[in-house]
């Protein structure tokens, strides 16, 4: 089974059902080298006394690593962690790693809840969006994605009167990406289906690069309009400008990588031919306009000459 086929077919689901509220986490994605000190920020605006930090590895359940019942109260959770936390203010609960290691690679989720009892963890917890942390021994393994858009098949269009564009992002590491579709300059969500998670291109390798596929389905009529523009945009979260880089290729910093397609009419009338037609029509119009102007000048000259002759004959 090919890598691209795996990307088309793969679906990966997280088991945790999380409630998002006014919980803010920064950064959303972070890739760093071994030994760096990092702080993951978490804040909430609901005035909750209880706050929590969880760690979740891919495909695994949440593990509580730290919690707090209020200002200056911090406790360790049920999972041994080399991180530390502080609670100087009610709304603020940062988590710090003094010396990051590859084993710290994971997703870190911050949550809060109302205080209804110190010993109970059954209160409704509100979660932030999470921070995806990747710690690497060598930053040369970081690669941005290559992105391609594949046009709909004629068979689908003729049988269903629908058109599905496929976007494929390949060759990126780590899996810190967000994919979106844009039509005529505006982001769209209707008709979009994106894989829940990126897939490893070589599942047997720990440092395998990733791929991600997404589909945008529109009506055949909409696709067959050459004026419609489709763009697949992949936001890649890579290195920062401050990270040291000694490789002979471009530094894989945080960046946007895109691919695009134009609508294609069913009679072979492509966006290129449409634009060429518009250009030809514009030139023809200018030629005709020029001829009309020249004709008007000639007519005016003839009228003037006739008036002069008439005046001379009267004289």
UniProtKB/Swiss-Prot annotation:
Glycan attachment sites: 72, 206
**Major site of localization recorded for this protein:** membrane
What is the tissue localization of expression for this protein? Expressed in MR1-restricted CD8-positive T cells.
Q: Which residues pair up as cystines?
A: 42-110, 167-232
Please list the residue ranges that the record places on the Cytoplasmic side of the membrane.
Answer: 305-315
Annotated Ig-like C1-type domain residues: 145-254
Record key words, sorted: Cell membrane, Disulfide bond, Glycoprotein, Immunity, Membrane, Receptor, Signal, Transmembrane, Transmembrane helix
Q: Which domain of life is it from?
A: Eukaryota
| Endpoints of the signal sequence | 1-21
Q: Which residues form the Ig-like V-type domain?
A: 22-114
Record field: transmembrane: 282-304
Q: Region T cell receptor beta variable 25-1: which residues?
A: 22-114
Subunit and partners: Disulfide-linked heterodimer with TRAV38-2DV8*01J31*01C*01 alpha chain. The alpha-beta TR associates with the transmembrane signaling CD3 coreceptor proteins to form the TR-CD3 (TCR). The assembly of alpha-beta TR heterodimers with CD3 occurs in the endoplasmic reticulum where a single alpha-beta TR heterodimer associates with one CD3D-CD3E heterodimer, one CD3G-CD3E heterodimer and one CD247 homodimer forming a stable octameric structure. CD3D-CD3E and CD3G-CD3E heterodimers preferentially associate with TR alpha and TR beta chains (via TM domain), respectively.
What is this protein's record name?
T cell receptor beta chain MC.7.G5
Q: Which source organism does the UniProt entry give? A: Homo sapiens
What phylogenetic lineage does the species belong to?
A: Eukaryota, Metazoa, Chordata, Craniata, Vertebrata
> Gene behind this chain?
TRB
């Amino acid at each position: 089974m090919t890598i691209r086929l795996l990307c088309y077919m793969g679906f990966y689901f997280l088991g945790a059902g999380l409630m998002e509220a006014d919980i803010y986490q920064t950064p959303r994605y972070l890739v760093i080298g071994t030994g760096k000190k990092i702080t993951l920020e978490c804040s909430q605006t609901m005035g909750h006394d209880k706050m929590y930090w969880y760690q979740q590895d891919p495909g695994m359940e949440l593990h509580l690593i730290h919690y707090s019942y209020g200002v200056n109260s911090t406790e360790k959770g049920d999972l041994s962690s080399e991180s530390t936390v502080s609670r100087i203010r009610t709304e603020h609960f940062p988590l710090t790693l003094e010396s990051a290691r590859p084993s710290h690679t994971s997703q870190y989720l911050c949550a809060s809840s109302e205080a209804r009892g110190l010993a109970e963890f059954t209160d409704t917890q509100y979660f932030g969006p999470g921070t995806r942390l990747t710690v690497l021994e060598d930053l040369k393994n970081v690669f941005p994605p290559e992105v391609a858009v594949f046009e709909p098949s004629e068979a689908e269009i003729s049988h269903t009167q629908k058109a599905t564009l496929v976007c494929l992002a390949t060759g990126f590491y780590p899996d810190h990406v967000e994919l979106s579709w844009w039509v005529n300059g505006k982001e769209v969500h209707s008709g979009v289906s994106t894989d829940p998670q990126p897939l490893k291109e070589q599942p047997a390798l720990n440092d395998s690069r990733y791929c991600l596929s997404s589909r945008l389905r529109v009506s055949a009529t909409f696709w067959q309009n050459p004026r419609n523009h489709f763009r697949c945009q992949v936001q890649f979260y890579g290195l920062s400008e401050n990270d040291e880089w000694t490789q002979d290729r471009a530094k894989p910093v945080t960046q946007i990588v895109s691919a695009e397609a134009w609508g294609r009419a069913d009679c072979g009338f492509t966006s290129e031919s449409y634009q060429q037609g518009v250009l030809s029509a514009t030139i023809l119009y200018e030629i005709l306009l020029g001829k009309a102007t020249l004709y008007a000048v000639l007519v005016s000259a003839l009228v003037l000459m006739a008036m002069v002759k008439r005046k001379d004959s009267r004289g």
